[in-house]
Amino acid sequence: MTKTEKKLRHYITKAIADYKLLDKGDKVMLCLSGGKDSFGLLKVLHGLIEDKTYDIDLHVYTLDQSQPGWDDSQLRKYLDDLGVSYEIETKNTYGVIIDKVPEGKTYCSLCSRLRRGNIYRYAKEHKMDKIILGHHHDDLIQSLLMSILYQGQIKSMPPKFVTQDGENTVIRPMVLVQERDLIEFAKEENFPIIPCNLCGSQENLKRKKVKKLIQDLALENPKVPSNILNSLSNVLPSHLMDKNLLNSLEN
């Protein structure tokens, strides 16, 4: 086991323990996009199941959105060699996106909604206890700043939440994992990564701008990324302007 994998194991098991993400006997569905993040999470979590750290039933779900150039042959081979239960489901969400999104606009919002809808549907149909997503430390801090700058809200990606209809529980075991470690791990493991030819080709994305902003600030103060993440668990309601929060404090 490499030093990088040990580091990933440490932060993933810490998040699972701190936020009570898994229970014995859980039937869980890990969403594998074909990118470095979900591949890294799968490899580590599978190892933790193999060495009996967690007693859970793992199923891997991949959504083939019918994008041009999609080739999952190597992904299938990887999953077969790993020996995990999996399904690659084909849904033509790409056609819907191309039809609905005006030329020049980014696809991310609609693509995300369609993908999320299929994930939730599949989880309910197969009676999954939990849905596992591969968002990491960097995703959380970028989402927080994006919410503040573009939506006027203080919110990000929680480690665990129940969907509005109460039907699905979503967990993110990599909230403490830094992207740079996942990049290194992907190189070490040589994962058969499938590039996204849809949103990956669009350069003017808000997330990329926010990511660069954080990187620039970190050049001046390396603690900036960790400080942003820590702020999500160090909230001072009395120092905010939310009337409902302030009223609840008074009462």
Curated annotation (Swiss-Prot):
GO terms for molecular function: 4 iron, 4 sulfur cluster binding; ATP binding; magnesium ion binding; sulfurtransferase activity; tRNA binding. A motif (PP-loop motif) lies at residues 33-38. It comes from the Bacteria. Keywords: 4Fe-4S, ATP-binding, Cytoplasm, Iron, Iron-sulfur, Magnesium, Metal-binding, Nucleotide-binding, RNA-binding, Transferase, tRNA processing, tRNA-binding. It holds the Pfam family ATP_bind_3. Its EC number is 2.8.1.-. Belongs to the TtcA family. The thiolation reaction likely consists of two steps: a first activation step by ATP to form an adenylated intermediate of the target base of tRNA, and a second nucleophilic substitution step of the sulfur (S) atom supplied by the hydrosulfide attached to the Fe-S cluster. Catalyzes the ATP-dependent 2-thiolation of cytidine in position 32 of tRNA, to form 2-thiocytidine (s(2)C32). The sulfur atoms are provided by the cysteine/cysteine desulfurase (IscS) system. HAMAP family: TtcA. This is tRNA-cytidine(32) 2-sulfurtransferase 2. It comes from Francisella tularensis subsp. tularensis (strain WY96-3418). The gene is ttcA2.
